[in-house]
Structure formats: C-alpha cells, structure tokens
Amino acid sequence: MKVLGIETSCDETGVAIFDTAAGLLGHCVHTQIALHAAYGGVVPELASRDHIRRLPLLVKQTLDAAGCELSQLDAIAYTAGPGLAGALLVGASFAESLGLALAVPVLPIHHLEGHLLSPLLAADPPAFPFVALLVSGGHTQLMRVTGVGEYALLGESVDDAAGEAFDKTAKLLGLGYPGGPQLAALAERGQTGRFRLPRPMLRSGDLDFSFSGLKTAVLNVVSAPTWRAEDVADLAADFQAAVVEVLCAKALRALEQTGLARLVVAGGVGANRHLRERLDASTRRKGCRVYYPEPELCTDNGAMIAFAGALRAAAGQRGGETPAVRVFPRWPLAELHSPVQP
C-alpha cells in the first residue's frame, strides 16, 4: 500500500510517500523560515499562501524521487490538526481534491500522532507499549501509548510549551528567528552554573510542566543593571540546562509510574543534543531505553503523516463516503480514537 502524506500545519510544507512493503520511498520539505524571519515569527496568512504555492511542486518532486505515479497511490493522508486553520485548510483541500480525482481514501491525521509514531520509522523501532515525551513549539506532553490511536495523557505543560519557552527566551536574548535553534547553538558556547535559574514543578510530584516562570527569570536577569551582554552564552546554557533537567526528571518519573521501560521522544525539541545526551544517560542507569526519530524527522514533515496514515489504513480506517474538508485547529491527542477495524 502506497500512501501520500501531506503536512501543512504551520510553516513547513511536507510531502512524502510511504509504502507498507518497501518503507519510505521519498519525502520533501520546504521551510518558510526566510519568509517569516523579517517578522520575528510565523505570519499565518503568509504561511497559507506559501503552502498553496509550494504544495503542487513538492508533490511532483516527491513522486519523482519515489519513482511513483499518481495512479499508483492507494491512499492520501493529511494533517487535519492541530495547527493554523488557514494552513491546515490548504493541505486538507488539496488532499481531498486529489483523493476524489484518484478515487482513493483520504485520511485526516493528528499532527502529534505523526510525531509520536515517527520513531517507529527507524530501523530498530520501539514496541508497544511505551511512554512518549512530545516536545515541540506548541506542545509538551507525556503520553502512555499502548497502540495506534491508544493514547493516555499522563501530564502536560500548564502554560508555555518547552519549544515556545526556547523561542520566547531567544527573543529576550536578542536572537533572530527561529529563536529556539539559535538559543541551543548559543548554549553550546556557554558554561553552566553562572546563573541560578528555577526548575519549575521539578518536585511537584505529578507529571505536568511549567516553563513561563523560567522565561520570567531570564527576563529578570537581562533587565538587571548588573547584566552584561558578553554573558549571553552562559545564560543560554543555564536556561537550556534548566529545561532539560525538568524534561528528563518528568520523563523518568513517567517510566517509574507506568512500569514501562521504553521512552519515545518526538517533536522539534527532541533533536536537541543536550536533551538526548541527558536522557540517554539517565535511562541507561534505570535499565530503560529511549528512542528518537531520525533528526530530519524531528521537525514537521510529510513522512510522519504518510506513515501514520499507512498504519491507520492497514488497521482498517477508511476515508469518508463523500469528500469533506475537515480540519481541527485545536485537537487534544487524548481525544483521538483507535483505527476502525474492518
């Protein structure tokens, strides 16, 4: 079964083809970083217009890379949410139109399910059940995963997501867009221990997160009369260390509370080198194992959507009887259901 995946939830246009017999045949991603850099963040209208321009060409490029014809597609999967409403509608309308023309099923896919399942694309994938740590610009969640569509929320951020905290703190430090990766790169040049920053909710006893107070602590540092601009790399390093410590502590607590020994880390922040090293060392000491997607699949991409669509189609999920453009800008992952069995 060959499934075309389309991702347009925010500022990346991603297209991929996954074959249940041969694996990932090809995928292409266009990032809009240059488009939004002048504004210091994503402009939804510009994002939607760029998806419209890029999507047809990316589909052709992906088909060429996969050595595949449109007529060989068995299903189409698209990101239906959560995300920017206009951006989601671009992908949804394209997918439904193409599905109607080809007379193939069209499957709406949850964006976070795509991230969560992306480590299963690796050569040595984790088996169910496992704990998943989803860390991105919009979400920080811990889930107990027992199968495709079987997700139980263990904890989540009560305010800013980890990636959002990285981006907002980068702005406070005067870094460019996208701020999170630039802050992480700056932290590589800094020394930890110079600034005493809080670890919010580290000892709360539950599995929830909070990062807004950490961001405020950084603001207080840079607003103080004693602040020196030459210390910015050290402050970035201490900020990153605080976020990583909280993420690791909560992930380990989730493993202990569930009795599971497998941890999956997904989302853009999951590519952070410091986070990976800390999680690798911590889980090894506990006799557990951590799994990650390939670095290129940590950020938004069509491969994870095609893969999730293929898993759901193989389990019996079908598209609607009639074409319907369905998007859900707000869509809790815990509300997602298992694929309908045939």
UniProtKB/Swiss-Prot annotation:
This is tRNA N6-adenosine threonylcarbamoyltransferase. Its cofactor is Fe(2+). It comes from the Bacteria. Fe cation binds at residues 111, 115, 300. InterPro entries: ATPase_NBD, Gcp-like_dom, KAE1/TsaD, TsaD. Keywords: Acyltransferase, Cytoplasm, Iron, Metal-binding, Transferase, tRNA processing. Pfam families: TsaD (PF00814).
